[in-house]
Amino acid sequence: MPVLNPTVSNQITGTVQPTFAGARDATSGTIATVSSRYTQAIRYSKVAGLRADTFSINRYFIEFDTSGISVTPADATLSIYGFTNSSADFFPVKATFSDGTIANADFDAIDGWSAGADNSSNVTKYSSEVTSWSTSGFNDITLNSDALSDMVSEDRFKICLIQSGNDLANVDAVAVVNTGLWRTFNVIHLDYTAGSAGYSHKVLGVAAGSIGKVNGVATANIGKI
């Protein structure tokens, strides 16, 4: 089973705000400066203050170079090594940041994202909701058909890990969440099973099934290229 490591991956820490909307609908944050063990990679927090509550949200972004995948994989697993856990259920969803780089302004670089809306149905989810977490080993997340399709159609496969119950759904917690809802992790990789070649191989980036002729000769009459 081939294994891919991320080309880039990083936590974007949102700015602490006096309102949920201000934290959740922000268009930028701050890239983490650590190189390992992101302590609150996926986070929603509502903290009581002397005068008012404050809110903060973190999201985690990952990119894999999938340019070498020319056939839709039979299956794929996103594996993340966990350390700590504080109940932040989440979804991996399709991200839209620029190839090869994650910037402060990518806090909302999520396909289908709309500020102020419940984005549960707007985004492209790459798996079912992740609701359990090992703090002493790899957490294997089975990716769905949308992810498999994008792995072959996109040269850069991009993911955002986003807390589901509040951040994605646009739901402010009723009670103060003093410790936040977050997960910590370090090592990430993508395992996939190569699909059947069939007639899906690409010739110079064009699907073979869409080519009628090669140098004037019908492909049906060509045994090999």
Report the location of each language-model feature.
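N-terminal leader/pro-regions and domain N-caps
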Residues: M1-S45
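Proprotein-processing/basic-patch segments
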Residues: P2-T15, D146, D150-A197
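Beta-strand-rich interaction/scaffold domains
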Residues: P6-V8, F83-D155
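A short beta-strand-loop element at or near the start of a globular domain
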Residues: A26-T84
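A general secondary-structure signal for short beta-strands and their flanking turns/coil
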Residues: I57-R59, P73, S136, E154-R156, ...
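Residues within well-ordered beta-strands of beta-sheet-rich folds
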Residues: F61-D65, D75-Y81, D140-N144, K158-I162, ...
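Intrinsically disordered, compositionally biased repeat/linker segments
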Residues: T193-I225
